[in-house]
Each structure stands twice: as structure tokens, then as C-alpha cells.
């Protein structure tokens, strides 16, 4: 790739005061900057302690300097790191000294961008750096580290290699018709295609769990008025986040609360009670509730266990299942178990539906069952050494690849159209390439790296 030859510099540590602060320099002038600031030639990859001086020889600070000649560095270029005291004034003086020596101020994420452009890491690994820095739980940090070490990229590369092999076979048959390869008769293409589709489905499922751990799961609390939805929100949040009264329709708008369960991020949304109403304000609240239901990763359908309607909770609101047609993402909460006499428990039906009996007001064991259930929904129990971090962008690319393979299979089996299959295979490979950066527009790269910290 065409990598810019300018030398860049930035403060690489977080803003504020600390024991240690780092100024990072990358580019062809890094070695010259090291000699000017330290006053001597630095031995590569060794720590050198001494004063950092300005152009007049005045000491700015003292600390450790590290010099990494390219290509054996993070960016693939010559890199200098100055580790001094972590005061903002001291660090700014060091940075200004580097700029005086010919560097320019780095853009956000430009160090990682140069590492990507110099093939030191791929795009998924570069994004994992930001994910590791921003991780909100230990599990999310571990997943981001595995992605940084290439776990996700290797899965994508393996899929890409299989697609390339399949494309070679298909396109050879198209280009050399005298070989008379019958795609359907020999079954080879279909077997290879189905193998790739199965593996892609597994990667997509695991990436979805990785994205939930990174971004957090949106949990919508829905149900009839006075079912105890706001009490459940307060119980999960551990504070009085919502007003609770005996008056039906107290909650008239969506209320959002961001919480963590064992370090795992959840975005909990309390909604207006679902019912027919003539009140204009409450009607708007119901419409917003239905919209939130449609956007949820998980729905907690709360019913009052003491009410007759609890026997058939999914008949409470006709539009409910229309708004969220996937029943697998609905957890039934039988609330007020302290009044109904229901035992506190979690039950899973033969079709996979989960029902939890609890008392939101009393908390206790029932609330703990719900917390464990939500952790399981996020993949907390399924994480392993093969887990990795993923982003919504990655999921879109994987879905695009999956759709292309499904379309290509239909073209082959229904019409025997090898040419159309070849095009679908090409599109699937391109979609996978967008994950690692093999196929990425400049606009996409700009958006990704601009979200990084300066100095990263």
C-alpha cells in the first residue's frame, strides 16, 4: 500500500495526571528526534534512561527512551517512545519538542492506521485495539485481546481460502467447457458450498455473541400496566430509577438505564404498559414501547402472577408478537410471586421458552435467577478460548456473505447457472474481505480509525 512518509507524534497516554506519560513518534524522522532529545544514538529495542532536552540544551524532563527501527515496530516504521512524568505540561513540552524537530501532530488512530497500511495487523485486529481499550468487562477485554491476536481474522481467512478454492473450481469449469464438468452431477460444488455455509453460520453466531459483549445487550421490559415493570427496572438497577405507584399508566415514556451484571453491559429499557387507551400522551408511550420491542435484543414480558390473564400472557396484546416475531428472544417474567404463592424458579419449556417466577419488589433468589439468565443470553457461559470480539460492521459483512452464498446455491440448484454462482461467490469473498481490510474503501478506513484515541 502507499503509506505516507510524514513523521507523526502524539501523547499516547490518557489525559490528566499520572505517574508516567508517553509521547510516541513514528516515521523517518524518529531516529533524528531521538538523538536530538536524548543527546546520543539509541541502541534499538533497549531502554535508555536520561534527560530529555530542548533545542537550547535545557532539560524538559527525564525518563526512559525506546527506539524501534522499522519494520520491526508497531507501525512498521521507525518508532520512538519517550516515557516521562505524566503531567500534562511536561508531556506537552515533550510533544512540542518533537513537532519542532519535523513531526506533525497525529490524527486520532493514525498510528494504528499506519500499522494496518504496513501489514503489521489487519483491520479487525486494528479495531480490536480500540475494543480492548474501551472494554467494559473482563470477558469483553479477553475477547478483544483474542481478536487482536488474530483469532477472528483466522476464522475469516479460513473461510476466504475455502471460497477461493471453490471459485477456482467453478470458474475453471466455466472457462474450459470442453472439460464438461456438471456442477450438479458430481456434487463436489454443492458439498464445498454447504461446508462453507455451515462454517460461516458458526462464525456469524459467535461474532454475534462477541458484538453483544462489546456493545451490550438491549433488554426491553414490556407488559400490561401495573405488572411491575418499573419495579423490575429498579431491582436490576439497584436504585429508584423509575417512579412506582399503584396507579395504572404511571410510566408513559421509555426509560433507559445502563447497568452491568458481573461486568457485562446491559441497556435496560422500561416501557409504558401495553393497553388500549384514549389518553393521547399514554398512546404515544404505547407506540414508543412497541418500537422499543422491535429493536430489542431480549424482551422481558412481565405479567402479574396474581391476575387471571397470567394464564395466557402472549394473548395480552395482539401486536406484541407481530412487533417481535422471534419468540426465542422473549423471556416470560411471572412477577409478584410473593403474592401469588408461585415458587421462585426458572423453567424452560420443550420449545425453548424460558419462564422465571420472581418478586421484583422483594428481589432475592428470583432476581438472581434473572441476572444469570441475562448473562447466559449474552454468551457469558459460552465463552471459551476461541471467543473473539466483533462489531456490528462485521456482522453486516458476514450476513452479506451468507446471503450471497444462499443466493448462489439457489442459482445453481434451480437453474444450473454456474456463471451466476461465480458472481455470488465473488461477492461473498469481497464481503469477508471488508472485515480484515482486504477490500475496504478509503471512506470506511477513515471512519474506523477516526474513532480511535489520539496516540493509538
Curated annotation (Swiss-Prot):
Cofactor, how bound (note): Binds 1 potassium ion per subunit.
UniProt GO MF annotations: GTP binding; GTPase activity; metal ion binding
Cofactors: K(+)
The keyword tRNA processing is annotated on this UniProt entry: yes
Matches recorded under SUPFAM superfamilies: P-loop containing nucleoside triphosphate hydrolases, TrmE connector domain
Disulfide bonds: none
GO cellular component: cytosol
GO biological process, one term: tRNA methylation
Main location: cytoplasm
Function (record text): Exhibits a very high intrinsic GTPase hydrolysis rate. Involved in the addition of a carboxymethylaminomethyl (cmnm) group at the wobble position (U34) of certain tRNAs, forming tRNA-cmnm(5)s(2)U34.
Protein name: tRNA modification GTPase MnmE
Native organism: Pseudomonas savastanoi pv. phaseolicola (strain 1448A / Race 6)
Taxonomic lineage from the root: Bacteria, Pseudomonadati, Pseudomonadota, Gammaproteobacteria, Pseudomonadales
